[in-house]
A protein has these predicted regions:
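Conserved phosphate- and dinucleotide-binding cores of soluble alpha/beta proteins
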Residues: 1-6
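Small-residue (G/A/S/T)-rich helix-start motifs and N-terminal tracts that mark the onset
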Residues: 7-169
Length: 169
């Protein structure tokens, strides 16, 4: 059990050292909020209450089309598990629709593992060689399990250069 004045210490937040702190609590010591807000620091600490306030309340009549359509470019032969995990994570963010652009070898894996995501198959069976049209998407994620094939790298560079959408790499 650890008490810390005003802010958590950085070591509380790392796996190697958090074990030694155990459960911790912050004790305010009356620092000026102006001084706290204007003191430069490379770190930001966000509490759960702040994150929860960012979530939109959904009406019982809301529909998936109102919450964005994302594209996840992921997977290669032997690495489809990463694509599946990425798709599940994207869906947990609250996105309305998710399309996964995957190599041909991953079609059945994706459809069975994440049936709520739509699958769009690359022309190549083992890796990503091009992303195709991405204009209809609100945001794009790229990376999980892509591998190191030169054609995939070319497709990645083309996407980064041409994408005018929010992009998560």
């Amino acid at each position: 059990y650890t008490l810390s004045f005003q802010f958590p210490k950085l070591c509380f937040l790392f796996p190697d050292t958090a074990l030694y702190a155990g459960e911790w609590h912050i004790l305010p010591i009356g620092l000026s909020s102006n001084a706290v807000m204007n003191t430069p620091t490379p770190y930001e600490y966000i509490e759960v209450s702040k994150i929860i306030s960012l979530f939109k309340k959904r009406s019982k009549f809301d529909h998936k089309g109102l919450f964005g359509h994302g594209l996840l470019v992921a997977g290669s032969y032997g690495k489809m598990g990463a694509a599946v995990l990425g798709a599940r994570a994207a869906l947990r963010t609250g996105i309305g629709l998710l399309t996964c652009h995957i190599p041909g070898c991953g079609y059945e894996i994706m459809q069975i593992s994440v049936p709520e995501a739509m699958a769009r198959v690359d022309k190549n069976a083992i890796c990503i060689t091009g992303v195709g049209d991405f204009e209809t998407f609100d945001a794009i994620g790229v990376g999980p399990g892509l591998g190191t094939d030169p054609d995939t790298f070319g497709a990645f560079l083309e996407l980064v250069e041409k994408c005018g959408k929010p992009l998560i790499i």
